UniProtKB/Swiss-Prot annotation:
Name assigned to this protein: 3-phosphoshikimate 1-carboxyvinyltransferase
Enzyme Commission numbers on file: 2.5.1.19
Gene3D superfamilies reported for this sequence: Enolpyruvate transferase domain
Oligomer and partners: Monomer.
GO cellular component entries: cytoplasm
SUPFAM superfamilies to which the protein is assigned, alphabetical: EPT/RTPC-like
GO annotation, biological process: amino acid biosynthetic process; aromatic amino acid family biosynthetic process; chorismate biosynthetic process
């Protein structure tokens, strides 16, 4: 089990206008997948722009433990020499994923199709998160799981299938992690593995599988869903990957620029995959000035330059269908809603309850302690925006990086400073968040 980092408290104070050009870290979802698929490929994969946060570094270490050669060649430049589909070696030690649910669940899928046994573990936060909905389909494929805690929680032992079988699996919720775990396990199975989802989730795994040479076909399923069919036992080939800037990380300086008067900030190379841009669409509905140019792409993932200027925001209603495209951004959207005029209602946020913390309750608590009127009704979050935030509160982050960053953003325009009890976990996804924001003009102390 990972040892907890020493707490790093921080205070956020009202700042002057934010300006300049920032390049936020590489996308976390793409970084995990590039390492894993590089390890499952034959030959060399060159990755540029890899996120070097703790979550991704733990995935890199897991790939080494499973037999791939993973090397760093300078800032954000990495190579992976893979072992091929089904070629993972028996790890000599526990695979420790720290705080990373994404890395842990995706690697479970990749291991499930290999005739090896691996022990999975993480920190206290990850040990509290449910794994059963990932494990159920992996057991259908042929894996065997032994877990010491109820609900399949970590630590657990996963014995991969000696003869994995293809499945047709309908996901119980819109979850890219469930879908990806099934597809990664299905790589080693003969025949076609099919995943059916009622609501489309992030499609990074499908796009990257194609980039590495897999035969995968996606068709529409109903009104909002998709059917993904993967032909198993391909020979994947190493490929170059340019990791775009993470839209979930870009959300924090973006919202900061919207709420701090006079701000004019440019964010470069931000991924705009349509299944990741729900926040941008919502903020534009609220009146945000967000412009795009310099459109380009790599490995099927589009990226753009964003120019964001301070804006007067208004309350809106966010439909539940938008949740899969912005599930990690609701915390900082709630901050924007607090600075808006009028009521913002965010519907269908049940998935926030099973993240690094119960993010629904934690978001409401973050706002309340800083003088914002907020209500939870079932799985809906209702924020009464008054155009300003009183501030002055101490935010408990519950070891959650996104709560910490959202609270720090909130304090940049509040009447009184906002204190955060611990910012150490920001390193899991955005190691340079504080210096990068200070470079743009933020006041943290």
């Amino acid at each position: 089990m990972s040892a907890p980092a020493a707490p790093i408290p921080l205070e956020s104070r009202a700042s002057g206008p934010l300006s300049g050009t920032l390049r936020v870290p590489g996308d976390k979802s793409i970084s995990h997948r590039a390492l894993i698929l590089g390890a499952l490929s034959v030959g060399e994969t060159r990755i540029s722009g890899l996120l070097e946060g703790e979550d991704v570094l733990n995935t890199a270490q897991a790939m080494r433990a499973l037999g791939a050669k993973v090397e760093r060649h300078g800032d954000f430049a990495w190579t992976v020499h893979g072992v091929g589909v089904g070629g993972f070696a028996q790890p000599a030690a526990t695979l420790d994923f720290g705080n990373s649910g994404t890395g842990c669940r995706l690697v479970m899928g990749a291991v499930a199709g290999c005739p090896i046994t691996a022990v999975f573990d993480g920190d206290a936060s990850l040990r509290s998160r449910p794994m059963r909905r990932i494990l159920d389909p992996l057991e259908l494929i042929g894996a065997k799981v032994t877990a010491s805690a109820e609900g399949g929680k970590l630590p657990l032992t996963l014995q991969g299938a000696s003869n994995p079988v293809p499945v047709v699996y309908r996901t119980p919720v819109a979850s890219a992690q469930i879908k990806s775990a099934v597809l990664l396990a299905g790589l080693a199975a003969p025949g076609v593995t099919t995943v059916i989802e009622q609501e489309a989730s992030r499609d990074h795994t499908e796009l990257m599988l194609k980039h590495f040479g897999a035969e995968i076909v996606t068709t529409l399923e109903g009104t909002h869903g998709r059917r993904i069919a993967l032909t198993g036992q391909p020979e994947l080939h190493g490929a170059p990957v340019i990791v775009p800037a993470d839209p979930s990380s870009a959300a924090f300086p973006l919202v900061a620029a919207l709420i701090v008067d006079g701000s004019d900030l440019v964010l470069s190379d931000v991924m705009t995959n349509p299944l990741r841009t729900g926040l941008f669409a919502t903020l534009r509905e609220m009146g945000a000035s967000i412009e795009e140019d310099d459109v380009r792409g790599d490995a099927g993932e589009p990226m753009v330059r964003l120019r964001v200027r301070a804006s007067k925001l208004r309350g809106v209603e966010v439909p539940p269908e938008r949740a899969p495209s912005m599930i990690d951004e609701y915390l900082v959207l709630a901050v924007a809603a607090a600075y808006a005029e009028g009521t913002t209602i965010m519907r269908g946020l049940h998935e926030l309850r099973v993240k690094e913390s119960d993010r629904l309750e934690a978001t409401a608590a973050m706002l309340r302690v800083n003088g914002v009127k907020v209500e939870i009704s079932d799985d809906d979050l209702i924020v009464e925006g008054r155009g300003h935030v009183p501030g002055g509160g101490l935010v408990a982050t519950h070891m959650d990086h996104r709560i910490a960053m959202s609270a720090l953003v909130m304090g940049l325009a509040s009447d009184k400073p906002v204190k955060v009890d611990d910012t150490a976990f920001i390193a899991t996804s955005f190691p340079d968040f504080v210096p990068l924001m200070c470079k743009a003009g933020a006041d943290f102390a």
